[in-house]
A protein has these predicted regions:
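Large, well-folded core regions of big proteins
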Residues: 1-291
């Protein structure tokens, strides 16, 4: 914040917001002027101007009200949000929005209130019903001899959301919740780092500490370390699947390592990788930025 205040004291002119790369004529003249680094620099002044507005409290309040109002307009009557207004509700979109609200409350230590709380309660009503409907389908399939291992991605996110928010499971969902929780341990063999991280958080919050540590140990085995980049997962990103997004997996693993304790050095090394991504190429989407 002090940096941006100093820019304001300089008059806040276009020149004070110019990126360091743009100011450096020698760098601009080299052959690398065709590289993405300079393309980044051409927009950095706009980024700085926008970042400066983050410290305007009146602007923050106004944006919060506008965002909540927009979320209210987009939420369906059953509590779900959809990809676009007018479409059927989406479990993944609803879960993601509810997760962000829960994570904000967890990070700030402030409980949701007012319209934010109302939005969250309606979203949970939809997600509880969706989880119950899926449980009924599972019971029906089991009668036909179908066997299930682990839980679906939607259910794992549902369990995670309950774990981090402290949401009380409705009486009608108790049996479904107990069943789902009993199957989480079977995800240890999953190839997805994101799945393992979320499963570990769910297990740890449920008091199944030993099982959670087994997941943590498995996650650590897949971490790569370099002096420059810190610690990270060296795998090819698949932006078309939620669990295949590298940033999502990275921060979820950081979360479980912090939650289970005794991993301070590893978490610090993982923070280094996170910052390096921003330094060299920007976080590549709004989702990745929110996670980071």
């Amino acid at each position: 914040k002090a940096v941006f205040e100093s820019w304001k004291l300089q008059g806040g002119t276009k020149e004070t917001f110019l990126s360091n790369l743009q100011k450096n004529q020698e760098v601009k003249n080299i052959i690398l002027s065709e590289s993405p680094w300079v393309l980044e620099a051409q927009t950095e002044e706009q980024q700085k101007e926008r970042i400066a507005t983050l410290f305007d409290l009146n602007n923050i309040r106004s944006n919060n009200i506008a965002a909540l109002t927009r979320l209210q307009e987009l939420q369906n009557s059953n509590g779900a949000w959809s990809w676009y207004k007018g479409m059927n509700g989406s479990r993944s979109v609803t879960t993601y929005i509810a997760e962000l609200n829960a994570r904000l409350a967890m990070l700030t230590g402030e409980k949701l209130s007012g319209s934010a709380l109302s939005l969250q309660q309606k979203a949970f009503a939809y997600l509880h019903q969706s989880a119950l409907d899926e449980y009924k389908e599972i019971l029906k399939a089991q009668k036909d001899g179908v066997k299930f291992t682990g839980v679906s991605g939607s259910i794992l996110q549902y369990l995670y959301l309950i774990a981090i928010s402290g949401e009380q499971v409705p009486a009608a969902n108790k049996a479904a919740y107990t069943y789902y929780l009993s199957k989480v341990g079977e995800l240890l063999t999953s190839p997805s780092m994101d799945t393992k991280a979320i499963a570990a958080i769910v297990l740890d919050k449920a008091g199944r500490k030993k099982e959670a540590q087994e997941f943590v140990a498995s996650l650590k085995e897949h971490l790569t370390k370099t002096d420059e980049q810190g610690m990270f997962f060296a795998f090819n990103e698949n932006p078309y699947t939620w669990g295949g997004m590298q940033m999502q997996a990275h921060v979820d693993v950081m979360e479980v390592l912090e939650q289970t304790g005794g991993n301070t050095d590893t978490v610090e090394e993982m923070k280094l990788w996170l910052l390096k991504q921003k330094q060299t190429q920007q976080w590549n989407s709004p989702v990745a930025t929110a996670d980071a």
